[in-house]
């Protein structure tokens, strides 16, 4: 009876009584975030399959800070933001930096900036080189389209700067993508166009074409008719919440449980999960087919480590018996350092943002060849620094070196964009810029079994000085935008605070170290890569050494992309659902 009472306390489903709760499901999905709800929707299309999603957050469909298309940032620090902090960042003023992640049905798609931009072709193609045959742009494009319901811009939105090429978009998917109705004033567009083109940054007619270099107005995940944010819950769960075979259960997964017998080739077989309710009481739910971990890049490693999967040295310190030695768990964390310039502008409200994606040659100019050579020469040093920072047995420096070499080729051979500059006009506003491909590598690990909601996150911001140099160059290039005609007659730049107008590189470096922020775009902590490179999951997204545990979230993305993670995640999750369904037949 006690067991049943705990289980019933965990259950929460819309329109159904908790009395109908069951303790056994074909699939258990850990996390009702951006990726988890995509997988849940697609798996439950088969009425003979039962799917449970375990999520500590709640339904936020009526939260104005979520539904509003102009309330970005209002949810930060509230009950639906995990509001993590990094460890002290030794190369960034020894400060702890905030990291935002959604704690709600829909995960971070409920609190992010809604930007829908995928990335460059070469970046997705690089995944194949890391031990993932079949993972490339061509394979993912159909899934991007499958998820998308693109809204063609109105004539006034086109006049205000919205552009698109229909062949790159889907029009029948569950995820609404478009431009906010408030984007109706076109007087801002010519200023941006003329200024960027004066700096040799061309207009990009569609930032979702697989080539993001240039500038353009990025679409967002919203319904243009109702002017409402279209997060993963609204797109993938609300329309199907009455399915009798799909349930969201409130609780926090502490660990995966294992069957006594082994699977093929001696693999571990998951038979369920241990779940904690809000009072810390636990129960075990049974999984008959698979466990899919979709807790996000900062939480998925914690679930794996608590389950005995990870670096034996770390597991021993936690008092956890090693089930599978996978030192890559929690490593390869890649987070983007970010900064901003504030300004006042004599401009009408535009209520949208222009994204400029710039290459190394754009921001380094005549020094690009020297930067390329210096960066290539520094790769072994960057790799050793990452290995030493993680401690013995966590990271193989040679493996990190290979990853950084692939990244170097993307930037300097394939002309991948190295920085994003975001120009937002809200009467006044800000210009935000960040390094897209940091060479720094960090980690996230479980603090203790008693603190499963408090990850130790160490992105090691600026561990590789390339990241600092690139952010400096991006900041200086952003200032050039505001001080170039015709924009300079319309705006007055007021930042960075404490930095003189003609600041030296050294002054920029000092300022950035003291004022940098984390972009809350973490990836890579359960990377889809060859095991000898530090990979955690294979090309089928299955955790190495397990028979039936997969990971589907940002932690599997092995290398940053030039877009915004949400777009990439919808495509990855759609494909993952097909992989899982295919394995069952």
Swiss-Prot record:
- Per the entry, which co-factors are needed? FAD
Q: What is its EC number?
A: 1.-.-.-
Any one GO MF annotation of this record: flavin adenine dinucleotide binding
Q: Alphabetically list the UniProt keywords.
A: FAD, Flavoprotein, Lipid-binding, Oxidoreductase
Superkingdom per UniProt: Eukaryota
| Signal peptide interval | none
Q: Name one Pfam family in it.
A: GMC_oxred_N
Residues annotated as binding FAD are 104
> Which residues are responsible for catalysis?
521, 564
Q: How is the cofactor bound?
A: Binds 1 FAD per subunit.
What general EC class does the enzyme of this chain belong to? oxidoreductase
Q: Keyword Flavoprotein: yes or no?
A: yes
Q: How does it assemble?
A: Monomer.
Family to which the UniProt record says this protein belongs: Belongs to the GMC oxidoreductase family.
What job does this protein perform? Glucose oxidase-like protein; part of the gene cluster that mediates the biosynthesis of the enfumafungin-type antibiotic fuscoatroside. Four enzymes are sufficient to produce fuscoatroside: the terpene cyclase-glycosyl transferase fusion protein fsoAthe cytochrome P450 monoxygenases fsoD and fsoE, and the acetyltransferase fsoF; the cytochrome P450 monooxygenase fsoB and the glucose oxidase-like protein fsoC do not seem to play a role in biosynthesis of fuscoatroside. Glucose oxidase; part of the gene cluster that mediates the biosynthesis of the enfumafungin-type antibiotic, fuscoatroside.
Protein name (record): Glucose oxidase-like protein fsoC
Name its species: Humicola fuscoatra
Tell me the organism's taxonomic lineage: Eukaryota, Fungi, Dikarya, Ascomycota, Pezizomycotina
The coding gene here is fsoC
